[in-house]
């Protein structure tokens, strides 16, 4: 653990990253046993004791420059921007302060931004150590702290927020259930928790080298450590985060003797040992995963765990390897995390029957990089000639660079210190098709060649490509490994693997943008290189007077490029035929984020999927509107021109030509006339009947209304006379 108590005169660990920087600032005359000042403290020229003044005055005069520079650097680390992007040391100190009741041996591995779902969402951070899962939230001084021991976890489950958004993890113990949501990279966090949980159940611990390797993969190479951190153990291979000068002497191929397939598969690579290398999932875990991207698919283990979004994982012991590694091999420190997979140890087993001893040695000693395997082809060209074509000022390389539109190409000669270990630097300018950014970018490529012996045909070339003048150029660079294996006199295999290495750990959104653009350019570059090598091979066979069609099928075997992400991306689709490549970007292996389409680009290359979807929706809407307009127009026309259509149809009919046809027409007309007359007769008859009924009704009405008049009396009555 980090020790924050002052210890003056305390020696720095030999593998501490800050010690190397401090030793470079010290003058050569400084004795190694001289006490070093504490970081962050000023060095006084005087002392309370006269004996200390006389004994230290000479040493202080020689290290004044180094002390000032070191103090300036320590003050810089505590500036305002360090609060916005804290280092791993600061995060670990915060972890120790927040969870002071944890054992002293617990060290922070990674932390994620998330929220705890209770009555309200409590936004905070989830801290993972080797044996504990901790959560801390502080909302307006309302603090929430949770500490869960991994051994007490009974169920680990992926969940969905509001049954829709897959960004939550549920952790259950015997007494409680904790629902954590708002993860930016839920699958990565789940996988890491699951593996640590299995380790805790199996009572297995990580070795210091594995632990620090995980920390480096999560936080990058700059951890902010000082000489006070004596428990730091530097991994020999940090996935490109350290150079051979920093991690130690380079292990030459000539110093390693072949001893067998099982032993050779566990030997270190020329740049350094690959022990303690975690799976690509863990290597890409971000400490600020709340900015998450779309994230990538998981490796084979995670794909089995993620059969459904709500899959529940129960503690099941992982099967142990049947063949343990030798105790002195680089894989002897591997714990239950399976940091070095069997697929990465053996690079090629499909052609073991025809491979020579040299190919078997190099394939076992030089595993591919952890990114992607881009070229795995056998060419009917000798290994020496293939090396000259790719790594010398050959006409093939010049023509290929011209096709990629590279300018200002400068190739420095190979260093002649040793034929087994050579080095050179290349500089050139690549075009960029980005309309908003720069139109070109300068590139510096450093190539290091390793060979088993001066007379050996095969070789390995490690290339580091730095692109300048592009966004986030100080965050990443690309690394490539060319492995040329001689199979026969005129037969060689070329394997090219690549990976993206980060100097600083970017946000997940920025990281996804970098990886998407870089991998697009890298894959296009090497696919183009593979096609050009195939053309050169064909030309070479034709010039030799051989039948190209008969020999190419038997002498050259092609393999589908594989993805070397530890099965993180799931099953890979086979690469299309080289002649039907639809995307060509000039950045290629040179890690330019913006690439220019090539001349053989297809008609639909480079179109975003969102634009295609929007175009399809617009076309469907236009078609529906056109159909609706046609139906309305048809109804209106039908309503106004029905009779005219009928008459027009009769007018355009076929006129009779013979007497028989005229007779038929007359008969039809007569029949039609008779039918019409009969109908009119019925109508008239019905009308007459109605009129008769009306007449009868009116007569009855008239009879009912008429009243007979009373008879008139002509004789006078006696009462009518006057008195």
Swiss-Prot record:
It is a single-pass membrane protein. PANTHER family: GRAM DOMAIN CONTAINING 1B, ISOFORM E, PROTEIN ASTER-A. The chain crosses the membrane at residues 610-630. This is Protein Aster-A. The modification Phosphoserine is found at residues 265, 269, 273, 418. Residues 370-541 form the VASt domain. Residues 28-38 have a biased composition (Pro residues). Cholesterol transporter that mediates non-vesicular transport of cholesterol from the plasma membrane (PM) to the endoplasmic reticulum (ER). Contains unique domains for binding cholesterol and the PM, thereby serving as a molecular bridge for the transfer of cholesterol from the PM to the ER. Plays a crucial role in cholesterol homeostasis and has the unique ability to localize to the PM based on the level of membrane cholesterol. Residues 93-160 form the GRAM domain. It comes from Rattus norvegicus. Residues 1-63, 257-337, 562-601 are annotated as: Disordered. One of its GO terms (molecular function) is cholesterol transfer activity. GO terms for biological process: autophagy; cellular response to cholesterol; intracellular sterol transport. The gene is Gramd1a. The keyword Transmembrane helix applies. Gene3D superfamilies: Pleckstrin-homology domain (PH domain)/Phosphotyrosine-binding domain (PTB). It comes from the Eukaryota. GRAM domain binds phosphatidylserine in the PM and mediates protein recruitment to endoplasmic reticulum-plasma membrane contact sites (EPCS) in response to excess cholesterol in the PM. VASt (VAD1 Analog of StAR-related lipid transfer) domain, also known as ASTER (Greek for star) domain is a sterol-binding domain.
């Amino acid at each position: 653990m980090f020790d924050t108590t002052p210890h003056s005169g305390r020696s720095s660990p030999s593998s501490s990253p800050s010690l190397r920087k401090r030793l470079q600032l010290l003058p050569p005359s400084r004795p190694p046993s001289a006490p070093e000042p504490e970081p962050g403290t000023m060095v006084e020229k005087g002392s309370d004791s006269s004996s200390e003044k006389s004994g230290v005055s000479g040493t202080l005069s020689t290290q004044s420059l180094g002390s000032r520079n070191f103090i300036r650097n320590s003050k810089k680390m505590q500036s305002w921007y360090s609060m916005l992007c804290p280092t791993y040391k600061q995060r670990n100190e915060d972890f120790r302060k927040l969870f002071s009741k944890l054992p002293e041996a617990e060290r922070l591995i990674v932390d994620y931004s998330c929220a705890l779902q209770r009555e309200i969402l409590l936004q905070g951070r989830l801290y993972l150590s080797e044996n504990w899962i901790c959560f801390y939230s502080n909302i307006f001084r309302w603090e929430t702290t949770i500490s869960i021991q991994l051994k007490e976890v009974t169920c680990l489950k992926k969940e969905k927020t509001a049954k829709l958004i897959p960004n939550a993890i549920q952790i259950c113990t015997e007494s409680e259930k904790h629902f954590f949501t708002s993860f930016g990279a839920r699958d990565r966090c789940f996988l890491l928790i699951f593996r640590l949980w299995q380790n805790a159940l199996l009572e297995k611990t990580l070795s210091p080298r594995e632990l620090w390797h995980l920390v480096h993969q999560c936080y990058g190479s700059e951890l902010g450590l000082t000489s006070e951190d004596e428990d730091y153990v530097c991994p020999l291979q940090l996935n490109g985060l350290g150079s051979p000068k920093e991690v130690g002497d380079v292990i030459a191929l000539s110093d390693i003797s072949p001893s067998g397939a099982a032993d050779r598969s566990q030997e270190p690579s020329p740049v350094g040992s690959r022990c303690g290398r975690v799976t690509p999932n863990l290597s890409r875990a971000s400490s600020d995963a709340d900015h998450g991207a779309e994230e990538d698919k998981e490796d084979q283990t995670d794909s089995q765990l993620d059969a459904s979004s709500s899959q529940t994982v129960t503690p099941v012991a992982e099967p142990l390897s049947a063949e343990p590694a030798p105790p002195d091999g680089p894989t002897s420190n591997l714990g239950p995390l399976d940091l070095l997979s069997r697929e990465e140890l053996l690079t090629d087993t499909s052609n073991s029957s025809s491979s020579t001893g040299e190919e078997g040695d190099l394939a076992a000693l030089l595993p591919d990089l952890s990114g992607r395997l881009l070229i795995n082809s056998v060419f009917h060209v000798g290994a020496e000639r293939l090396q000259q074509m790719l790594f010398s000022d050959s006409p093939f390389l010049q023509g290929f660079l011209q096709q990629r539109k590279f300018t200002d190409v400068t190739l420095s000669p190979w260093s002649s210190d040793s034929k087994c270990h050579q080095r050179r630097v290349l500089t050139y300018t690549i075009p960029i098709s980005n309309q908003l950014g720069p139109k070109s970018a300068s590139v510096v490529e450093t190539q290091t060649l390793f060979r088993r012996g001066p007379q050996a045909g095969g070789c390995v070339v490690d290339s580091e490509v730095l692109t300048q003048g592009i966004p986030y150029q100080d965050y990443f660079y690309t690394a490539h490994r060319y492995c040329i294996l001689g199979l026969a006199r005129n037969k060689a295999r070329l394997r090219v693997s690549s990976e993206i290495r980060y100097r600083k750990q970017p946000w997940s959104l920025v990281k996804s943008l970098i990886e998407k653009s870089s991998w697009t350019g890298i894959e296009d570059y090497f696919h183009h290189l593979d096609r050009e090598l195939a053309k050169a091979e064909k030309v070479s066979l034709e010039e030799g007077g051989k039948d190209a069609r008969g020999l190419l099928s038997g002498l050259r075997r092609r393999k589908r490029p594989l993805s070397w992400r530890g099965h993180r991306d799931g099953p890979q689709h086979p690469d299309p035929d080289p002649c039907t490549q639809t995307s060509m970007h000039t950045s290629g292996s040179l890690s330019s984020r913006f690439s220019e389409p090539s001349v053989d680009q297809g008609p639909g290359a480079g179109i975003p999927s969102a634009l295609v979807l929007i175009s399809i929706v617009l076309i469907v809407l236009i078609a529906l509107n056109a159909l609706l307009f046609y139906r309305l127009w048809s109804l209106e026309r039908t309503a106004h021109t029905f009779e005219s259509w009928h008459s027009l149809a009769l007018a355009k009919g076929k006129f009779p030509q013979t007497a028989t046809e005229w007779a038929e027409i007359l008969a039809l007309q007569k029949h039609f006339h008779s039918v019409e007359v009969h109908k009119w007769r019925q109508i008239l008859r019905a009308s007459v009947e109605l009129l008769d009924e009306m007449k009868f009704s009116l007569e009855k009405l008239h009879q009912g209304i008429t009243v007979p008049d009373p008879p008139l009396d002509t004789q006078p009555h006696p009462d009518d006379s006057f008195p």
